[in-house]
């Protein structure tokens, strides 16, 4: 869905006299916007929405702050029960929620169903394991007794993307609600119906008012709220530019931030790999969600001994993908999320080709309504080209031929991003050796980078910092307080 933003007249608002007045005046200096969403399959207008006014958001923050005072003392049993109800509702409403995802951002319906299932699994995972992850940690100091108490910190803000509108929220909201924090979510402006559906699910599950709140505002207004002292931590999944802006705003009030800023994952194929298996995974790793995944396999680095075979089979597989309506079960390649996304990706391909890259397959927009672009393979890519340094967010694969394993590792690391990567080999120890040398947050052997509730997710370099999912993800926004007992009047 494309977000078409247009000004809406705002009546003057009177703010209560407290520490947030200056910030609220700053926020009021920007016009409130209206947002019109467009189905990327056919570029037809779906619905129009009004952005929340600053006064409404001010009330939401105040309500969240008040809710935190009771929620932080709620038992793990009660918090887990709420999350289990949320997961159950997601599963019961899977069909309608999946259709909503597909309508708003163009994901294949079958993949939308998978996203809802994974989101529910994440919520259940933290309901089942949160208490264990947050248990007191006993220490053994030289004198006395001590332990670490893990406590919630307050109101959190999550800035979430459109490409996985339920999954991204689940991995932010579920662990933090289980901790005892409360969450505000500023979702991408092109998935407003998904955003509203998530808030409605929490309400239906019996969440207290203020525990989970959707902030329907444009990205231009976010930084002022990040600086609000009542918000104690911020998480963002988005672009490098958005991450830098958020980190700067959070730094002004010295609050914790977690950033996941995309990637350009290397997919290394060594000469001893099962090529047919590698090709099958390459298609899935590159084309899942029409290539719009932060951890999608984007750079295919293949040793010379098997490069021709891999490229021929990979090309054949992509050539046969059926393009069409994402609601059609036979469709294998749907539209990008918006016309703007398709224009940007086509421009990246053109700039790369103009600089000398070769097109093995595709390379153009598809002549039909909607945000479609052909499945594309580029070769002969050199430093300085768009395809070399930029993240290609769509069905475009960059293919590199290298002499050996050592060259593959060097090329894999020659990227500003460091989110994920994968290596294909029949030798487990060799795969581990390569994985150890790749500078990323995640490496998978004989599988493209993937996600599941019990594995940590996050990157290095310009892919951001911090971790989500697993036991590591639940500890990002906690106060780890040292508590020490002493039986000595004076140990010295």
Task: Give the location of each predicted region.
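Rossmann-like NAD(P) dinucleotide-binding subdomain of oxidoreductase/dehydrogenase enzymes
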Residues: 135-277, 402
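Residue-level signal for inorganic ion chemistry
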Residues: 43, 79, 101, 123, ...
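Short, well-ordered beta-strand elements within core beta-sheets of diverse protein domains
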Residues: 47-52, 67-73, 158, 267-270, ...
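Conserved C-terminal structural/oligomerization subdomain of aldehyde/semialdehyde dehydrogenase
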Residues: 42-48, 231, 268, 322, ...
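ALDH superfamily catalytic-core signature
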Residues: 46, 241-382, 445, 491-492
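N-terminal Rossmann-like NAD(P)+-binding subdomain of aldehyde/semialdehyde dehydrogenases
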Residues: 23-144
């Amino acid at each position: 869905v494309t977000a078409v933003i247009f000004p809406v007249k705002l009546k003057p608002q009177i703010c209560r006299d407290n520490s947030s007045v200056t910030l609220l005046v700053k926020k009021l200096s920007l016009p409130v916007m209206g947002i019109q969403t467009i189905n990327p399959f056919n570029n037809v207008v779906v619905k129009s929405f009004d952005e929340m006014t600053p006064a409404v958001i001010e009330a939401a923050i105040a309500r969240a702050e008040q809710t935190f005072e009771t929620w932080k003392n709620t038992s793990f049993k009660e918090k887990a029960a709420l999350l289990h109800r949320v997961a159950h509702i997601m599963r019961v409403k899977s069909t309608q929620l999946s259709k909503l995802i597909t309508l708003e951002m163009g994901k294949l319906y079958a993949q939308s169903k998978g996203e809802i299932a994974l989101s529910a699994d994440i919520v259940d995972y933290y309901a089942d394991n949160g208490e264990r992850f947050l248990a007191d940690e006993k220490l053994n100091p030289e004198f006395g007794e001590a332990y670490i108490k893990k406590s919630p910190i307050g109101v959190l803000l999550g800035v979430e993307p459109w490409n996985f509108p339920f999954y991204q929220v689940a991995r932010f909201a579920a662990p933090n609600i289980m901790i005892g924090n409360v969450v505000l979510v500023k979702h991408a402006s092109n998935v407003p119906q998904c955003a509203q559906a998530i808030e409605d699910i929490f309400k239906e599950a019996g969440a207290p008012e203020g525990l989970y709140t959707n902030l329907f505002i444009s990205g231009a207004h976010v930084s002022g709220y990040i600086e609000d002292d009542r918000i104690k931590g911020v998480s963002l999944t988005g672009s490098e530019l958005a991450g830098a802006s958020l980190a700067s705003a959070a730094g002004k009030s010295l609050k914790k931030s977690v950033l996941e800023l995309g990637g350009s994952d290397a997919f290394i194929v060594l000469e001893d790999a099962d090529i047919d298996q590698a090709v099958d995974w390459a298609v899935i790793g590159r084309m899942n969600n029409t290539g719009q995944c932060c951890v999608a396999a984007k750079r295919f680095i293949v040793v010379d001994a098997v490069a021709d075979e891999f490229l021929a089979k990979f090309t054949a597989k992509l050539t046969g993908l059926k393009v069409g309506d994402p609601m059609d079960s036979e469709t294998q390649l749907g539209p990008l999320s918006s016309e703007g996304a398709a224009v940007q990706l086509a421009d990246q391909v053109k700039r790369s080709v103009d600089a000398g890259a070769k097109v093995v397959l595709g390379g153009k927009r598809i002549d039909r309504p909607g945000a479609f672009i052909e499945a594309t393979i580029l070769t002969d890519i050199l430093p300085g080209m768009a395809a070399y340094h930029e993240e290609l967010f769509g069905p475009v694969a960059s293919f590199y031929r290298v002499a050996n394993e050592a060259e593959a590792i060097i090329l894999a690391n020659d990227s500003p991003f460091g989110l994920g990567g994968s290596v294909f080999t029949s030798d487990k120890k060799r795969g581990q050796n390569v994985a150890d040398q790749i500078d990323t947050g995640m490496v998978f052997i004989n599988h493209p980078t993937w996600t599941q509730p019990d594995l940590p997710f996050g990157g290095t370099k310009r892919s951001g910092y911090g971790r989500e999912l697993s036991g590591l993800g639940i500890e990002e926004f906690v106060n780890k307080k040292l508590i020490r007992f002493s039986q000595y009047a004076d140990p010295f």
